[in-house]
Amino acid sequence: MSNIKNISAENCYSTIKENKDAYLVDVRTPYEWETFGRVDKDSFDAQYIELTLIDEEGDENTNFLDQFNSYGILKNSEIYFICKSGARSMHAALILESNGYQNLYNVEDGFVIGWKPSGLPSK
């Protein structure tokens, strides 16, 4: 049974806004960041990481876990994952959960469906 918690984009933002110990990991592709925009990392205190899980061709980044681990994030840190609509972010959270990370959150409505239409800060 997974312990990953689903959270809306609005609830995610209100949680990370003043939490410098949390992390928001955007697992979309560079194309998506350029085309649809990015979260405005200057609008909240949490650490922001862009780390692609699946590339434009649909291939999974086999180095995702190693690249994530290179940030030195503690396994009990609050980590929020966001993608376009919530599927890839859940996949990323499941990868980390299976490697001992504990406080994982999936932004279930994603950036395009949740974050941006809600008027949350983006660039």
Task: Name these PLM-found stretches.
Residues 2-23, 30-78, 87-123:
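Rhodanese-like catalytic fold shared by cysteine-dependent sulfurtransferases
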